[in-house]
């Protein structure tokens, strides 16, 4: 890539000089803003700023869904005035209180995640424009609405790479403004930090959308393809007889050069290339638009990074960016695995060999003279990684290098355990390692083996062990058979939901006859192991919900099989339809999940997308039954993704660790004034049921999460058939997993047709006896009782300005 340098030149003595100015920084955005102003139909918030959504939408959400703060500690250590004790409603030296400080802490996580995705998008956009040119069309499948998140924010509907640049500049500009508010002596009100966090969440989905649409277009990924190929997944899929290149991270740009080199030199069947985290998902999408037989494999999520390294299987490791462990170099160095850093965001202190000759770098790394290197030239990267893997494979195979102990070493380590319990205290998942070690001493290794799936591979246990027992290696030793059999299938990320699919399902979603969209996303910080998300997905799929998934969740769902040996991806269709399991793609593909909800409003309801976030979000909150699940959320990106869903009116359930994010958004269902909206036909207030009753909350167990999510798909606009279907699922799931009927089911009944058909008579009796409702038993109709009346033509909205009288 050419580098810009400063300098000057004179044209005084030159004749017939023509100067061409190719690009002025910021000019694209300015031109786009002027173009957006000319739109015939547009909402009030084209190119919004920090304040744009505050009063019209964000504060309305935050009034109903009040922030519940969960501080990690009572101190603020932000500046040299501190540390300040903020307990007991005290204020710090700068004047900030605990609410404001906690709001800032949550907000900081959100903008960090937003920046991560935006920087990912900027890197890909610049690289792909340099490689393919600005005119490369955004071919994303059979759709006209290509970039709903970009359109909502800017009014723009880009059709090629170059037209995306103004949206990218917009996100970057607003991120700078947002980051400035974190400085000491800036914002101090918790409610305004929450509003800014919601705005940042909306920007995050723009950044993610940019990241994914440019790579789908340039790298020939599947394009809204429900039949995208099935990809092998799991540690057991790796052929140990072949040299193995392991790639880790989220930015697939450099990996495509490695795959190209493999194909050009006929090496696809002579070595293995597989990945961890979202780079794995995206390398399995590369050139799969025509459904060619895939050869790249997926190992799994971040929780498997250290396990894979300790196994000794990789011959070379390449890292790019995001969710990459900080100890990969020292861990790999112990096992003679060279590490190559391919992105400037992670360089690990390694020597930079970007300008070096590839032959020389191969020799340096092969000899062990350096543990790894930085290589930012993608052409060289592709050659270096493949050649090095092919040479390191035989060398490491001959030495049989692995961190897994021998039987004798295993017995010695187990015998050393003093049963002090320090490992269990240090474990984020509180795994009972001492108990498992105790049984292992007696020859029963099943308890240790059970820990394999539950362990997130963080090695905190090892660092506190007084006996210096390599506990992770011990667990992996007894799980060798389990690891060898870890072979599943994951459908390659298919890309966005097509316009045709939205047209087919839009009415069902708004009326409620499709019970809802369940979005399983996020990280692998599971409290009880990866199978939780499999159980959740299976339950909702069997009940005809649409289950969409991305990232770690998409991978972990594919790890398990039923009694017939089939994964969920083999059992259920890949289309956006009732009972469909839709792997959208990697983390950045999450933008297509919110995009699908936005497209329901735009395509089915003909609402204007351009600069119209509040109206679109209002429509989704009142009409589109959807709920997200980030069961293992750990990262800042997870908080920004979830917050971007929240501003759109989409609730999200997080796992038990997620109280550490410091903030939830939970409504008080007993405050009836909070559960009123306007009828857009006449501007009159109308009561609605308390649904969804949260925008962001946590659950302790997957059994608790399932009925919570089913309930969160209830919407005010459900027709009677839809409400009956949703109540049936919610009540059955509540009974199945929590052992009793929900206490507040009656609040969602508007007339007898809303009741679950199979239990209608019994529920009518309960309404009469427990709640005093009047029932006509001859006609089996409700005469009086419900506070909410059903009106199929009602137009619920939270925005007074959308009412006809306004």
UniProtKB/Swiss-Prot annotation:
One of its GO terms (molecular function) is iron ion binding. One of its GO terms (biological process) is response to hydrogen peroxide. It comes from the Archaea. Its EC number is 1.2.7.4. It is an enzyme of class 1 (oxidoreductase). [4Fe-4S] cluster 3 binds at residues 417, 420, 423, 465. Its cofactor is [4Fe-4S] cluster; [Ni-4Fe-4S] cluster. [Ni-4Fe-4S] cluster binds at residues 250, 278, 323, 523, 552, 587. [4Fe-4S] cluster 2 binds at residues 76, 79, 84, 94. Disulfide bonds: none annotated. [4Fe-4S] cluster 1 binds at residues 73, 77. Pathway: One-carbon metabolism; methanogenesis from acetate. [4Fe-4S] cluster 4 binds at residues 427, 455, 458, 461. CO binds at residue 117. PROSITE patterns: 4FE4S_FER_1 (PS00198), 4FE4S_FER_2 (PS51379). Belongs to the Ni-containing carbon monoxide dehydrogenase family. Cluster B is an all-cysteinyl-liganded 4Fe-4S cluster; cluster C is a mixed Ni-Fe-S cluster which is the active site of CO oxidation. Cluster D is also an all-cysteinyl-liganded 4Fe-4S cluster that bridges the two subunits of the CODH dimer. Contains two additional 4Fe-4S clusters, dubbed E and F, that probably transport electrons from ferredoxin to the B cluster. This is Acetyl-CoA decarbonylase/synthase complex subunit alpha 1. The lineage of its organism: Archaea, Methanobacteriati, Methanobacteriota, Stenosarchaea group, Methanomicrobia. The gene is cdhA1.
